[in-house]
Amino acid sequence: MSWSPLSREAPFKYIRQAIKLFQQRNGKVIVEIGCIRQRFNHPIEQEPQDCPSRLDGHSTVHFASTGAQFFSVDISKAHINLAKELTAGHQNTIIQQIDGIKFLKNFFKPIDLLFLDAWDVEIPDSAERHLEAYEVAKKHMSPQGLILIDDCDVGMVEGKLAPAVNLYGGKGEKVVPVAQNEGWKVLMRGRCVLLSRQ
């Protein structure tokens, strides 16, 4: 059977596990770089099966639902507007249209959960941009901090999205090895990579 981007694993279980650990560690602040892009037609607490946007994790809504201080940023006005609509009523949620790296350079709260999901894998410098975001954010990560990175199961081969050829691909290709060298541990690996300082 030939591989298709549509046959990929959904990020749901990784997002749920990151939230579970965040709550067990009494986390206070979540930062998401790259917010929700599509609507969904299923209850948010259920893993999507037949939802057309099944491969999107709807992370923005999951994180807003925790009640923690939640900051989500994106450069797309359309994505920001959708995120604001879908998280309306969540008191501790701040959605902002700004470049993720610029945001992180001006963010000074301790981060308990960082989600890196901004520059699409198809963008030539996606891995480098996510590494830059990590480098800026790491000094703000709390001692019990978690980092979740989406789209680590794919890469670009001959100009097309394909399964990752390295252990960590896509958005985590550069971040994960650097973070591991700095003491971060991989808790989960697949569609997403979940890293922990503990």
Q: What kind of feature is each model-predicted range?
A:
Residues 2-14:
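Conserved SAM-binding loop and adjacent beta-strand
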Residues 113-127:
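A short SAM/SAH-binding and catalytic strip from SAM-dependent methyltransferases
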Residues 124-198:
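C-terminal substrate-binding/active-site "lid" region of AdoMet-derived donor-dependent transferases
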Residues 16-104:
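SAM cofactor-binding core of SAM-dependent methyltransferases
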Residues 6-9, 48-51, 93-95, 122-126, ...:
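Short, flexible loop segments at the rims of nucleotide/cofactor-binding pockets, characterized by
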Residues 37-40, 120-123, 153-155:
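Short acidic, S/G/P-rich loop/turn micro-motifs used as interaction or catalytic elements
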Residues 31-33, 73, 114-118, 147-151:
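Active-site flanking residues adjacent to catalytic metal/cofactor-binding acidic residues
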